From Swiss-Prot:
It is an enzyme of class 3 (hydrolase). Residues 197-226 are annotated as: Disordered. It comes from the Bacteria. Residues 6-149 form the Nudix hydrolase domain. This is RNA pyrophosphohydrolase. One of its GO terms (biological process) is nucleoside phosphate metabolic process. HAMAP family: Nudix_RppH. Keywords: Hydrolase. It comes from Paracidovorax citrulli (strain AAC00-1). The gene is rppH. Accelerates the degradation of transcripts by removing pyrophosphate from the 5'-end of triphosphorylated RNA, leading to a more labile monophosphorylated state that can stimulate subsequent ribonuclease cleavage. Its cofactor is a divalent metal cation. Transmembrane segments: none annotated. One of its GO terms (molecular function) is guanosine-3',5'-bis(diphosphate) 3'-diphosphatase activity. PANTHER family: NUDIX HYDROLASE 26, CHLOROPLASTIC, UDP/ADP-SUGAR PYROPHOSPHATASE.
Length: 226
């Protein structure tokens, strides 16, 4: 379902944990990481589509999250021709999105990447709020910056670090001022490694997705081999 300009209506989801870190998923069988997102079906409202995509991609139910805010207007990005099926070129232009900021009120183990038979992600991790701007695929970077910037003022005030992020001190024409070397190191108590600890379904510890380095001090999360 495209609008007359060739954009598909879509929702994007920024999911926060209790430290105001964001869910970051690795697309299945690729090296590409992104926020959950998906199309709005005919007859759906953006909020209905958001809750459907939240379950399909992350395995969460409405009771697991609190809706904090949403973007006021559609945010658009164009998809380069090389990513568009040949039969859709000339018709499909990209996505127009309403973005939702959610906070997880459940637990990390409520996340399930295998909630459906057509999973979108095969790995996930928590990242600091602005980190995705440096690691998302280039053609989505502009819409990510618009969404993150518009929704940043709604971040729950429960984290000194995120109060600093909300101060608006940014460098080089809108890029994040926070050090991007501080990608989430899984230091939350719910993800520290302890004997007998159960990870979320399909998850284990792995290298930093930005570098592929197996630095044990910078673990990520991924689906185990086999």
């Amino acid at each position: 379902m495209l609008d007359r300009d060739g954009f598909r209506p879509n929702v994007g989801i920024i999911l926060l944990n209790q430290r105001n870190q964001v869910f970051w998923g690795k697309r299945i069988r690729t090296h590409s990481w992104q926020f959950p997102q998906g199309g709005i079906d005919r007859g759906e409202t953006p909020e209905q589509a958001m809750f459907r995509e939240l379950h399909e991609e992350v395995g969460l139910q409405p009771c697991h999250v609190r809706v904090v805010a949403r973007t006021r207007d559609w945010l658009r990005y164009e998809v380069p021709d090389r990513y568009i099926r040949r039969d859709a070129r000339g018709h499909y232009k990209g996505q127009k999105q309403i973005w939702f900021l959610l906070q997880l009120v459940g637990h990390d183990w409520d996340l399930n990447l295998r909630a459906t038979n057509h999973p979108e992600f095969d790995a996930w991790r928590w990242n600091d709020y602005w980190v995705p701007l440096d690691v998302v695929v280039e053609f989505k970077r502009g819409v990510y910056e618009m969404a993150l910037t518009e929704l940043a003022r709604f971040l729950p005030r429960n984290d000194q670090r995120n109060r600093y992020l909300r101060s608006g001190m940014r460098q080089r024409e809108g890029a994040p001022e926070v050090s991007l070397g501080t990608t989430t190191q899984l230091r939350t108590t719910s993800l520290l490694v302890h004997p007998g600890m159960e990870l979320p379904p399909g998850a284990s510890f792995d290298p930093d997705p930005r570098t592929g380095d197996g630095d044990p001090g910078m673990p990520g999360i991924h689906k185990p081999a086999g």
